Amino acid sequence: MVLSNVKIFRLKSHRAFRIGPMIKAVAGNLLVKRFYQPKLERIPPASLLLKQKIRLAQNGSTTSTENPISFSQTMSEIFSVLQPSAPDLDEDETSGLKRDHLLTERLNNGELGVIMNKFFNPSSTHNNQLIDTNILLQNFPKLSGNDLDLLDFAINEKMRGNWNDLKQDFIQLWYYKSFGFLGPRTQFVLTNSSPSVRSQFLKLPFIEYNWFLLQNNKNANILPADVQNVVKVFHLDDKRFTWKSIDPFSKAIISFVVFVSIYVWLDESAKQKTKELPAQKSTVISE
């Protein structure tokens, strides 16, 4: 009996000797995972984030049909019946995300560089120089709607980063797209400038046309037709918006919407009260 007890004691002590370091190692790993969190410097690509947003938007639209009908959902259905031609917000959000994803793929594939090399002097773009002004004025109107969409998307994406990394031709194209070939200046071209510059200038918005007429030569003879093109006068109406001024059809729609809103609110409050009663009874029974 004594020998057997000694063997059992040695066996238990041997197991404890082997298990002790294992427990320490596991505890050390847990402490390291608990207090040490490595910093991930790599940022997920924009295309992956857009795909995730599209997937979440689609999942949200499918799961929303399984949830109970809420007040906002009821009102949206009412307005969709009253305005069948109104766009669906979920579909607009999903289509917008898909459009951003497509533009991101086009930008990552280098399509913007292909467009710039095609329309704006390839030699200057490769040497990181400015685009020739005549080429810019002649070829910029030739850009299609898809090209302009890609340019706008590239401007919005690249303006978030370091502007020192942008090429000069891209900055020039960005500047021209935003402000025109004259830029955001207080003085534009003289009234006695060449006809080609004047004709190109008159295609700009009317507020710059106003500067063109008045800034550089205040004594210039302005025709009444020019004043009508520059100045837009709006007269305020003395009539106020009141309930009596609404037409009967609009009154009927507003009254119907208010009635349905009150009905849905009363129904939701009644359901909430019925849910609270069993909970109160259960608490009383438990006490």
Curated annotation (Swiss-Prot):
Primary location class: mitochondrion
KW Mitochondrion (keyword) present: yes
Membrane found in the keyword field: yes
Cellular compartments annotated: Mitochondrion membrane
Keywords from the UniProt entry: Membrane, Mitochondrion, Transit peptide, Transmembrane, Transmembrane helix
Transmembrane domains' residue ranges: 250-266
Stretch forming the transit peptide: 1-24
Membrane topology: Single-pass membrane protein
GO cellular component terms attached to this protein's record: mitochondrial membrane; mitochondrion
Similarity comment text for this entry: Belongs to the GEP7 family.
Job of this protein: Involved in respiratory growth and required for cell survival in the absence of prohibitins or GEM1.
Protein name, UniProt field: Genetic interactor of prohibitin 7, mitochondrial
